[in-house]
Amino acid sequence: MHKFRLIGRIDINNENVVKGKCLEGLRKIGNPEEFASRYYKSGIDELVLMDAVASLYDRNSLIKILKETCKNVFIPITIGGGIRNLEDIQEALNAGADKVAINSQGLRDINFIKDAVRNYGSQAIIGSVVAREFRYSWEAFIDNAKHRSGVDAIDWAKILEDAGVGEIMVTSIDRDGRMKGFDSKLIKTVTESTKIPIIACGGAGSASDISSMINETNCDAVAISSILHYEHTSIEKLKDSLSKNGVQIRK
């Protein structure tokens, strides 16, 4: 049986860790290298470094931060935000990233994702679904949730799987930063519609939220931020609680 992964997500604007709610109202809360080092030392399984505004302003400023982070952090690191071409992927991997997450550019040109998988392998490419609920369905958003894509989020997840990505990170815009629980219905719909690993993101407020979501959705990992950034709990406490609830967790 595979072991469930706890992933620390660090959203970055320029050289600062930022966090808001529903991917809006971002405010500076710290230094990304310090956050990454602290989470690594505390036992996080993986990290995601996400440029919060890169796709809006046609830039990719994570490389310097990634290089500094990799000097002291020795777990898998994914970077995302502003990945537009194969050169961006190559630069990220050369700088120390293990994987890249792609959303906006993939929705604009699915052949980019296919080319990325063909060149670097599915294990290096994470498909990203950023979804907002509208009545009885979810729509995929681009540019850090600023613009609607017109594509159904579940369909987007299926397209990503067909394109060959190794796993999919599903972010609920409605739950992001609120720490009131995941959109389990969204995550469950994605897990039931695909056969590759799914990372749930958006809404973790407690170990109970994570345990409930695992039981309801059968996802493979969670990416968490606010609950750690604001020190509502620790990685050690989360892992201990999940283990006591029968979750096969990495120690």
Describe the function of each predicted region.
Residues 6-10, 47-49, 77-81, 100-102, ...:
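Hydrophobic faces of well-ordered beta-strands that scaffold small-molecule active sites
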Residues 113-120, 214-224, 228-251:
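C-terminal helical cap(s) of enzyme catalytic domains, especially alpha/beta-barrels
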Residues 11, 39, 47, 79, ...:
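Conserved, mostly hydrophobic/aromatic
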Residues 12-14, 18-19, 97-170, 174-175:
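Conserved anion-binding
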Residues 58-78, 115-130, 180-205, 246-247:
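Alpha-helix-loop-beta-strand connector modules within alpha/beta enzyme cores
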Residues 28-40, 84-90, 149-159, 207-210:
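Short, acidic/polar
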Residues 46-65, 104, 169-180:
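Glycine-rich, proline-tolerant flexible connector loops at the mouths of alpha/beta enzymes
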Residues 77-78, 83-99, 185-222:
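Catalytic cores of alpha/beta
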